[in-house]
C-alpha cells in the first residue's frame, strides 16, 4: 500500500499524446497505444472558474451509481486519480456515488482533519456535486417542477450538507472542518418552474420570507454570509455555483440571463454528435454560456450509452451499464472528439462502466486518450462526418433526454 500511495501522490505520469491521430492510430473501436508518447494530460481553463481542467472528467454515474456485481467503483475513482484526471462529478440523486468517493478519498488522504491530510492534492482537483432540491426554504408545487433528492432533506442546504457528510464525514450528517465542494450545480434545470423556483428571493433576499430559492441559499454558503437566515454559522462550504441541463436550451438560456449578478460560473450540458437532431445546445445555450465566460462541462457524450447497445432511456439497473469500448461502426473516440471540439466546451465528464489492465478494453484509458484534443482540432466538415457516423446509432434517435426541434 505504501508504494501505491507514493505513486499516487506524485501524480504519476500517464501515457498520452496531443497528436494521437498523427501517431497512426487504429481506425477501430479503440486507440492503439503503441505509438503514443508520454505527456501530461491536456487541460483547458474553465472560464471564470479559473481552473485548469483536464479535458476528461470522471462522471458520477455509470458504475458509480448503478454498480454491476463484478465492478469495484472505488478502483475506478482511484484509477482516474492515477491517470491525472482532475475533475470529479457526483450528485445527491446518484445513489451510492458520493459514498464511493468517500472510500476512495480516505485512501487518498483527502479527508480534512485526518492524519496525513493532503491539502495540496485536494486543491489540485475540482469536485462538483449537485442538488435537485429547488428551494432553500419553504417551497411550492407546480406542474413540471423537479424537486427531488436521495436524501431525507427538503432544501438545497440539506443536500449540500449531505454531500459533505457522505464524501468527507461520517455519512450521518457530520462533516469535518475544512471540508468543501469546488462547485454545486442546481441539477437538471428542465422547465420554467425550475428556474422560477431557484430564483425565489435572488434579487431581494429576506430571511422572513416564507419561500427562498436554492440559489440565494447557495450564495450564503459560498460567501459565508447569512442573508437568508439559513446559514447562522456563516459557513463557507462551496467555492462556485452553477447548473446543469439536458432538455431545453431556452430554459437554460433564461437561467443564465436572469442572473443579473453573474453568480453562475459553471454549466453542465448534454452535448453529443446527435445534438443537431434535437433542439440543439451547441448553437443556443452553449454560446450564451461562453459569452458569459462560464466554465462549460459536456455530458451525455455517448447519450448515456444509447449510442451503443443500451436502450434510449434512463439507466435504472446495473445491467444497463455499458461495459465495452465503442464499436467498429461508431468508435467512441470520434464521439469524444466531437463533444470536445464544440465551441465553448472545456471538459467532458463520462461515466465509467469498466476499467481493465488491457488498455484496449479499459473505458477510462480509451476515453482519456481520445480526450487529448485541442478545441479547434476538427473542421466543420470533420464534425459533419462524425454526425453521419452517429446516425448509425438508432437512426440518430439517441437523445431521449433532449427536447425535439
Q: What function would you assign to each model-found segment?
A:
Residues 1-10, 35:
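N-terminal secretory signal peptides
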Residues 9-28:
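N-terminal export leaders
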Residues 29-60, 374, 379:
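C-terminal segment of N-terminal export signals and the immediately downstream linker at the start
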Residues 46, 58, 88, 127, ...:
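Conserved, mostly hydrophobic/aromatic
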Residues 46, 260-263, 280-405:
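Structured C-terminal cap/extension of enzyme domains
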Residues 60-70, 141-155, 319-327:
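Active-site mouth loops of central-metabolism enzymes
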Residues 90-108, 191-193:
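Glycine-rich, proline-tolerant flexible connector loops at the mouths of alpha/beta enzymes
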Residues 146-273, 290, 294-297:
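Glycine/proline-rich, positively charged
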Amino acid at each position: 500500500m505504501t508504494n501505491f500511495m507514493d505513486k499516487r501522490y506524485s501524480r504519476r505520469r500517464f501515457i498520452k499524446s496531443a497528436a494521437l491521430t498523427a501517431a497512426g492510430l487504429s481506425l477501430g473501436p479503440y486507440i492503439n497505444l503503441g505509438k503514443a508518447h508520454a505527456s501530461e494530460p491536456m487541460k483547458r481553463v474553465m472560464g471564470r472558474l479559473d481552473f485548469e481542467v483536464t479535458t476528461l472528467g470522471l462522471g458520477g454515474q455509470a458504475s458509480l451509481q448503478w454498480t454491476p456485481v463484478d465492478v469495484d467503483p472505488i478502483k475506478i475513482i482511484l484509477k482516474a486519480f492515477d491517470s491525472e484526471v482532475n475533475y470529479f462529478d457526483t450528485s445527491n440523486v446518484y445513489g451510492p456515488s458520493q459514498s464511493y468517493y468517500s472510500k476512495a478519498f480516505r485512501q487518498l488522504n483527502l479527508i480534512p482533519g485526518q492524519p496525513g491530510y493532503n491539502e495540496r492534492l485536494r486543491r489540485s482537483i475540482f469536485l462538483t456535486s449537485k442538488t435537485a432540491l429547488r428551494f432553500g426554504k419553504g417551497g411550492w408545487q407546480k406542474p413540471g417542477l423537479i424537486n427531488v433528492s436521495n436524501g431525507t432533506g427538503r432544501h438545497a442546504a440539506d443536500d449540500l450538507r449531505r454531500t459533505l457528510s457522505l464524501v468527507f464525514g461520517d455519512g450521518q450528517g457530520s462533516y469535518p472542518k475544512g471540508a468543501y465542494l469546488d462547485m454545486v450545480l442546481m441539477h437538471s434545470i428542465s422547465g420554467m418552474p425550475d428556474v422560477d423556483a431557484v430564483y425565489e428571493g435572488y434579487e431581494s433576499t429576506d430571511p422572513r420570507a416564507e419561500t427562498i430559492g436554492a440559489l440565494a441559499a447557495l450564495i450564503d454558503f459560498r460567501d459565508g454570509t447569512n442573508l437568508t437566515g439559513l446559514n447562522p454559522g456563516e459557513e463557507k462550504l462551496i467555492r462556485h455555483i452553477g447548473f446543469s441541463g439536458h432538455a431545453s436550451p431556452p430554459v437554460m438560456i433564461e437561467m443564465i440571463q436572469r442572473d443579473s449578478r453573474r453568480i453562475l460560473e459553471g454549466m453542465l450540458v448534454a452535448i453529443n454528435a446527435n445534438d443537431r437532431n434535437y433542439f440543439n445546445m451547441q448553437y443556443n445555450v452553449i454560446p450564451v454560456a461562453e459569452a458569459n465566460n462560464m466554465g462549460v462541462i459536456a455530458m451525455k457524450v455517448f447519450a448515456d450509452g444509447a449510442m451503443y447497445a443500451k436502450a434510449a432511456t434512463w439507466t435504472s439497473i446495473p445491467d444497463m451499464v455499458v461495459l465495452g469500448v465503442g464499436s467498429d461502426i461508431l468508435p467512441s473516440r470520434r464521439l469524444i472528439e466531437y463533444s470536445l471540439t464544440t465551441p465553448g466546451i472545456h471538459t467532458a465528464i463520462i461515466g465509467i462502466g469498466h476499467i481493465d489492465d488491457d488498455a484496449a478494453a479499459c473505458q477510462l484509458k480509451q476515453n482519456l486518450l481520445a480526450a487529448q484534443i485541442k478545441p479547434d482540432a476538427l473542421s466543420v466538415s470533420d464534425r459533419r462526418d462524425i454526425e453521419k457516423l452517429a446516425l448509425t446509432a438508432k437512426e440518430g434517435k439517441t437523445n431521449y433526454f433532449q427536447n425535439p426541434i
